[in-house]
């Protein structure tokens, strides 16, 4: 990818191809904010995009993640409302070196939830790896968005990190190691 738009678009296309090939089984979107932020910061610095453009790219990505659909049986639809496919976007927490993984794109993701035309929806499931040591501004913003939208779930970054280290990312049921399932 040469630009932030391309990085986001290619990540989405890769995710869409993967989730479609597994016929809707739960598949994490991942912890991508830090990856995207590298492209956003470079494009912002060079003047290719504005902060408004960066926010719009994330808004559009969230909307695209919400419109993924599968052909389901009536029995399946009777069990699960809203045709969920359990796409989890994980964010925040800390790296093994103690650096926060909160980025400007972490704020952009949460800001998308304030769009009046977006409304509530199951996808993407936004999971914040919470730690009391996260930046104060981010914790306050998480609290505000949680109160306003009820659209965020939280997991203890410290507990997950103690077991999975930096190899973790979030699945709807349990953390999983990249590249294969690890022995628990």
Residue map of PLM features:
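Conserved catalytic cores of very large enzyme subunits
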Residues: 1-184
């Amino acid at each position: 990818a040469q630009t932030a738009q391309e990085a986001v678009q290619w990540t989405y296309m890769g995710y869409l191809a993967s989730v479609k090939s597994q016929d809707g089984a739960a598949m994490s979107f991942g912890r991508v904010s830090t990856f995207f932020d590298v492209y956003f910061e470079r494009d912002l610095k060079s003047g290719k995009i504005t902060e408004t453009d960066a926010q719009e790219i994330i808004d559009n990505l969230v909307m695209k993640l919400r419109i993924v659909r599968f052909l389901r049986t009536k029995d399946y639809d009777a069990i699960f409302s809203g045709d969920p496919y359990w796409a989890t976007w994980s964010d925040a927490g800390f790296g093994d070196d103690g650096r926060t993984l909160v980025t400007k794109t972490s704020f952009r993701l949460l800001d998308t939830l304030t769009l009046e035309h977006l409304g509530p929806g199951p996808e993407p499931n936004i999971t914040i790896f919470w730690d009391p040591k996260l930046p104060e501004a981010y914790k306050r913003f998480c609290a505000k968005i949680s109160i306003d939208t009820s659209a965020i779930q939280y997991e203890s970054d410290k507990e997950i990190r103690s077991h999975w280290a930096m190899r973790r990312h979030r699945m709807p049921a349990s953390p999983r190691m990249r590249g294969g399932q690890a022995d628990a």
